[in-house]
Amino acid sequence: MAQIHHCVTLLLILCCSGLCGAIQWLGLTVNGSRVAWNESGHCRLLDGLVPEQSQLCKRNLELMQSVVNAAKQAKLTCQMTFSDMRWNCSSVENAPNFTPDLSKGTRESAFVYALASATLSHTIARACASGELPTCSCGATPAEVPGTGFRWGGCGDNLHYGLNMGSAFVDAPMKSSKSGGTQATKMINLHNNAVGRQVLMDSLETKCKCHGVSGSCSVKTCWKGLQDLPHIANELKSKYLGATKVIHRQTGTRRQLVPRELDIRPVRESELVYLVSSPDYCAKNPKLGSYGTQDRVCNKTSVGSDSCNLMCCGRGYNAYTETIVERCQCKYYYCCYVVCKKCERTVERYVCK
């Protein structure tokens, strides 16, 4: 019996290594933050990287601090984006040892893959523009003719370099011959990575700075810049809510992903996809990667996902009061400072039973 249990455990580990291993680099916030990144030997110290990622690390040591920064940003942004949902992305902090919510091809893992992919390319593109990387600089001057009243200038985010280096790093586990996992899981991971990068590309916009006497803005200098990560994460959250469950089946001479409920069409390049349905995340169940919602803060007056009715799954909630101190009765004095008083206010909070 013990031997059977050992075999089942080993099988689960092997399956997970092919699926969740592709985002194990998010665990670099644990061991990568303490590395100086000045020797190629440092790349061997990192857990969770496939050989191809280790080689990228050795060839691009200067890039690795951006990778660590991206891992931090991806975790933080995910938790902020889902703070009002039953699944609040808290499990991403377990990286590189993920729970089933992020290791079984779920809707949640689709979001995290897409966000992580977008975040790394975003971080690298911004690092180029800020002069943090010696291997790249500002983005290329746009080919389009500038409009009336503005000229191209400034230092735009280097999206081209960010996409090239970011995709090479995050897609490596799915393309590695030494990684485990099924062809289906590799395909959905690559697909969701690409969706994240597409949302990032779509966020590129023209940003401008005014020049002129007394702020008249007679001339504007403009450049192409990416929107901030919270905007990109919210776009991906919309895709998460409308994600498509897929199957991996033979179509003609090759296997491809098709929607499970509507398999008459191929999967759209713009939609997130997943293989396994998620639990409702109401009750704590480690086997499903659910932390439950007991003791989660809820909003009594909301009708959205953070409402006490939805967040608490109908179990009810407890109320308590809290005294907060905040600035009040602020006055501006010429010139140039503000003086405020401190006021106490009692607020009522609600937590799920």
UniProtKB/Swiss-Prot annotation:
CDD domains linked: Wnt_Wnt11 (cd19343)
General remark: Xenopus and other lower vertebrates contain duplicated wnt11 genes (wnt11 and wnt11b) resulting from an ancient gene duplication event, but the second copy has since been lost in mammals. In addition, X.tropicalis has two very similar wnt11b genes suggesting a further recent duplication event.
Pfam family, one: wnt
Name of the coding gene: wnt11b-1
Signal peptide start and end residues: 1-22
Glycosylation sites: N31, N38, N88, N299
Function, as annotated: Ligand for the frizzled7 transmembrane receptor. Primarily acts via non-canonical Wnt pathways mediated by either Ca(2+) and PKC, or by JNK and dvl2/dsh. Depending on the cellular context, can also signal via the canonical Wnt pathway mediated by beta-catenin and dvl2/dsh. May also inhibit canonical Wnt signaling. Maternally initiates dorsal/ventral axis formation by a canonical route, which signals via lrp6. In a complex with wnt5a, activates the canonical and non-canonical processes involved in axis formation.
Lipid tethering residues (O-palmitoleoyl serine): S214
Subcellular location: Secreted, Extracellular space, Extracellular matrix
Record text on subunit structure and interactions: Homodimer. Secreted homodimers form a complex with wnt5a homodimers; tyrosine sulfation of both wnt11 and wnt5a by tpst1 is required for this interaction. Interacts with the transmembrane receptor fzd7/fz7. Interacts with lrp6 and ryk. Interacts with tdgf1/frl1. Interacts weakly with frzb1 and strongly with frzb2/crescent. Interaction with frzb2/crescent antagonizes wnt11 function in the neuroectoderm, but enhances it in mesodermal tissue.
Disulfide bonds: C78-C89, C128-C136, C138-C155, C208-C222, C210-C217, C282-C313, C298-C308, C312-C352, C328-C343, C330-C340, C335-C336
Protein name stated in the entry: Protein Wnt-11b-1
Posttranslational modification: Glycosylation is required for protein secretion.
Biological source species: Xenopus tropicalis (Western clawed frog)
